[in-house]
Amino acid sequence: MPPHFIDGEPHDHQHDRPRRVRVAGEPVRIGIGGPVGSGKTALVAALCRQLREELSLAVLTNDIYTTEDADFLRRHAVLPDERIAAVQTGGCPHTAIRDDITANLDAIDDLIAANPPLDLILVESGGDNLTATFSSGLIDVQIFVVDVAGGDKVPRKGGPGVTFSDLLVINKTDLAPMVGADLGVMRRDAERVREGRPTALISLTEDPSSGPALEWVREQVRTLADVHQ
């Protein structure tokens, strides 16, 4: 796998998590998880706005009892309505992305059938704690989003999402002075617990493109699907 470039630094970490067996021509699937309020849906919206002119993409959201996140994306017209789908998990949000992924797989099949050909599907989990991870049978790579508002201790606390995601996004860096968070400490702690896996610090307020997270997604599509722009 080519090295990741996050904040200008190369990363060539070979991940230990088993990979989904991909079929030629299938869209790349990227999971986006993280706690409630960390900015997952805002990141999905930013990625859609930046990528919709260069890739054929769709979004699948997960909510417990509503379709709120999908409705938000439709209201903001980040993609045509038929490219946005929702799964109502009806219970713990991590169950639908890790333990019983049937509803998500069915929804992905429907998106692929309705929007051929797709290059990329973003799968957003429902809000959960630091333990949520995606099944490797559902997605190819996963992003985990935390935010600065929780304080600079969040990366240090670890958890499967923080430690083992393919990309850790530390969001809302513009709030650091207001909550007394040290971004240098957060970066250092993330690098320590993640053992070389890349971390991106972003502020969608200051850079609506999502900066390094966007470039990482582009790299994954190029690497996994051989989509050349």
Swiss-Prot record:
The record, for Pfam families, names:
cobW
One GO BP on record is: urea catabolic process
Binding sites annotated in the UniProt record for GTP: G34, P35, V36, G37, S38, G39, K40, T41
Q: Could you tell me where the Basic and acidic residues compositional bias lies? A: 1-15
- Molecular function GO terms recorded: GTP binding; GTPase activity; nickel cation binding
Entry keyword set: Chaperone, Cytoplasm, GTP-binding, Nickel insertion, Nucleotide-binding
Location within or outside the cell: Cytoplasm
Please give the residue ranges the record annotates as the region Disordered: 1-20
Entries under PANTHER family matching the protein: UREASE ACCESSORY PROTEIN G (PTHR31715:SF0)
Q: How does it assemble?
A: Homodimer. UreD, UreF and UreG form a complex that acts as a GTP-hydrolysis-dependent molecular chaperone, activating the urease apoprotein by helping to assemble the nickel containing metallocenter of UreC. The UreE protein probably delivers the nickel.
Q: Which NCBIfam families match?
A: ureG
Q: Which family does it belong to?
A: Belongs to the SIMIBI class G3E GTPase family. UreG subfamily.
Q: What is this protein called?
A: Urease accessory protein UreG
Task: Give the organism the record lists.
Answer: Rhodococcus jostii (strain RHA1)
